[in-house]
Amino acid sequence: MSDPDRARVLAAAGVSRETAERLDLYVAQLRRWQPIKNLVGPATLTEVWSRHIDDALQLLDLAPEARTWLDLGSGAGIPGLILAIAGRERGVRVDLVESNARKCAFLTETARLTEAPARVRNARIEAVIGEYGGTDVVCARALAPMTQLLAWTEPLLKTGTTGLFPKGRDVQAELTQAGAQWRVVNDLVPSRTDSEARIVRVTALAAPSHR
C-alpha cells in the first residue's frame, strides 16, 4: 500500500505518533515473518494497511468503552494484536488465543517489540473459553461460520460480553443457519474496508432452541 494510503488510514483512526510507529513496527514484523510462517495471504501484503490494519481498527469504533478484549484464532494478530496496539493509550487489554505454536511465536515477539498490552495463549478455544468471563468484547476474523463462533463463545455472550465478528458476502446465510439453533440479538454493521462485508455485532444470545 502506498504511503498516502497509510497516512489516510492513520488519520481516519486518529492515532498518536507513538501508536503509528508501533503499527509500522507491526507491519514490518508481519513482512519479515511472512515468508517463514505464512501468516496472511501473500497477495494482501501489498494492501496491508487497508486489508488488515484498517479492517481491524474499525472494531475499536464499535466498542469505544470496552477495555478488555478476547481475540479467538488470532493468527497474525488480526484483529487482536492491532487492537492492542491502537487501544494501548486508552487502557485496552487484549487476550490472544491461538492453537498454532508457530503463530504464537510471532504474536509473542511482536507484542513485546510493540509494547502492546496483549497476552498470548497457545491453546484450543474450547479448552480455555470459560476462563474469560467478564470480558467486554470477544472477536474473531476469518475463523469459522457463525454457528461455530456462537458455540465457542456461548459462555461469554450469555453473560454480557459483546461479540464482534467480521464477515463476508455470505453473512446472511451464516446467520440464517445459526438462527436454526440460537436466538441471537445482533445487528449488521457495514465494513468500511469492503462494500460487501459486514461486522456482526452480537449483544445477546439465548440457548439453542432444541435444548
Swiss-Prot record:
GO MF assignments: rRNA (guanine-N7-)-methyltransferase activity
Chief localisation class: cytoplasm
Reaction(s) catalysed (UniProt annotation): guanosine(527) in 16S rRNA + S-adenosyl-L-methionine = N(7)-methylguanosine(527) in 16S rRNA + S-adenosyl-L-homocysteine
EC number: 2.1.1.170
Keywords of the record: Cytoplasm, Methyltransferase, rRNA processing, S-adenosyl-L-methionine, Transferase
UniProt feature coiled coil, ranges: none
Gene3D superfamilies per UniProt: Vaccinia Virus protein VP39 (3.40.50.150)
Enzyme class: transferase
One annotated Gene Ontology cellular component of this protein: cytosol
SUPFAM superfamilies: S-adenosyl-L-methionine-dependent methyltransferases
Binding site for S-adenosyl-L-methionine: G73, I125, E126, R141
Location(s) in or outside the cell: Cytoplasm
InterPro entries tied to this protein: rRNA_ssu_MeTfrase_G, SAM-dependent_MTases_sf
A Pfam family hit: GidB
Function: Specifically methylates the N7 position of guanine in position 527 of 16S rRNA.
Family: Belongs to the methyltransferase superfamily. RNA methyltransferase RsmG family.
Protein name in UniProt: Ribosomal RNA small subunit methyltransferase G
Native organism: Methylobacterium radiotolerans (strain ATCC 27329 / DSM 1819 / JCM 2831 / NBRC 15690 / NCIMB 10815 / 0-1)
